[in-house]
From Swiss-Prot:
Keywords: Cell inner membrane, Cell membrane, Chaperone, Membrane, Protein transport, Transmembrane, Transmembrane helix, Transport
Record localization: Cell inner membrane
Membrane topology reported for the UniProt record: Multi-pass membrane protein
CDD domains, alphabetized: 5TM_YidC_Alb3 (cd20070), EcYidC-like_peri (cd19961)
Residue spans crossing the bilayer: 6-26, 341-361, 416-436, 454-474, 495-515
Any one GO cellular component localisation term in the record: plasma membrane
Protein's name according to its UniProt entry: Membrane protein insertase YidC
GO molecular function: membrane insertase activity
Gene3D superfamilies linked to this entry: 2.70.98.90
Its job: Required for the insertion and/or proper folding and/or complex formation of integral membrane proteins into the membrane. Involved in integration of membrane proteins that insert both dependently and independently of the Sec translocase complex, as well as at least some lipoproteins. Aids folding of multispanning membrane proteins.
Subunit details: Interacts with the Sec translocase complex via SecD. Specifically interacts with transmembrane segments of nascent integral membrane proteins during membrane integration.
Organism of origin: Vibrio vulnificus (strain YJ016)
Amino acid sequence: MDSQRTLLVLLLALVSFLLFQQWQVAKNPAPQAVEQAQTSSTLPAPSFADELDPAPAQQASAKLITVTTDVLTLSIDTVGGDVVAADLNQYSAELNSANAFELLRDTQGHQFIAQSGLVGPQGIDLSSNNRPSYQVSADSFTLADDQNELRIPMTYQANGLEYTKTFILKRGSYAIDVEFDVINKSGNNATLGMYAHLRQNLMDAGGSITMPTYRGGAYSTEDTRYKKYSFEDMQDRNLSLTLTNGQGWAAMIQHYFAAAWIPRNEPGANLYTRVIGNMGDIGVRMPNKTVADGDSAHFTATLWAGPKLQDQMAEVAPNLDLVVDYGWLWFIAKPLHWLLSVIQSFVGNWGVAIICLTFIVRGAMYPLTKAQYTSMAKMRMLQPKLQAMRERIGDDRQRMSQEMMELYKKEKVNPLGGCLPLILQMPIFIALYWALMESVELRHSPFILWIHDLSAQDPYFILPLLMGGSMFLIQKMSPTTVTDPMQQKIMTFMPVMFTFFFLWFPSGLVLYWLVSNIVTLIQQSLIYKALEKKGLHTK
């Protein structure tokens, strides 16, 4: 019994520490800016990098055009046709703020933009100081109520070639198709290819002091479904991977939101990263195409700029939904998230959905919980016999072990019976933690009364204090034979430690743990009453 309680304490402490540590340092640590010469001398850049000007864009903007749909508001620079701002219209910057969340922006001290262009012998984006200045028919474009698709063509002519860059946005979608059409009237062959990358400051920290998260790169290939590539990785070496079948993507991700470039039908495309000063690029370079005189060529890629909505992202590209990172227990967390979403669609409140999900999960695990408490009760009933055995045998460990096993066999008690159910439950608890932690749906979602945002900490710490109190009640209800003073101090300190950890946890997670503790109290009462009737428990 003592060993089981000790294991319980250690498991809870370990899980709490690991979750808290992961939550605190999941973000990419702010890296130090590096000189370009150091980067280039350490590892050679991908072969195509020589085509691009090594300096960040310095050319003054000719004009910014505004593109508005029901879910996005974009600012596109007519110089180069870069997306220099992306506001998510249905997500506020802060709770109760009228300002939309800015995913992409190009401001003093912060740059996160989506660039795309044409490189190669006849490319027009080889130099960041001499990029094409596109012509466009209007300063703003808005998706009308009777429209499902909005197209923004931008044109440019040089050296006998006609270039058209078109942005295509659809109602309700965060996926933006970017197409290049090139008509060759130069009298000679023209060779060029498309590139598309995301550029971001390497010094940007992820999240805030109370909600630090990962901010950095990620990619997918035919061989690697999903892999993070942090800013530190980019500084260590330039990424260069070939998409043999053209299936993959490159992304910059952060908590709840992501931007990604996805090539379309481009076997041989190259995923790459490069670091220039304190700026990091991650993107894709499509193979060159040779366009004969009088002929034309078409290039296309898709830009995702929006929240981490798994269903929509899975439709845009294979494995893009994996940016919702549930960790190694994804196969448990993903069904739990699906079930949570289904419940919310009925009850209409994410906090109530968390409560319902907790009751469902704990109810499903009730047989394991009952087996755990029953085994612990049987072990507790054997304590007098085990103590007498220790006094009789003394320090002969081998004999003590043999007689203990004989006693367990005679009494039909499994000494690990109380530990195994607990160990089996832990992955479910951890998976549910990540399902709640990664759900953008909880962002700015209210519960009741003072809880206005389930993704933020409880402003008055009421839920963490209630959670700590529920842990204290569980301890008081649980029989113990622990006599070691150190173990007693550890067990007494556990509710205090948990309460401290949970003070800064998102209130949705604290709500889950509080409700889980309440369910534990209910289940304990029911199980102990049943054990009393069997003579295995006394008040």
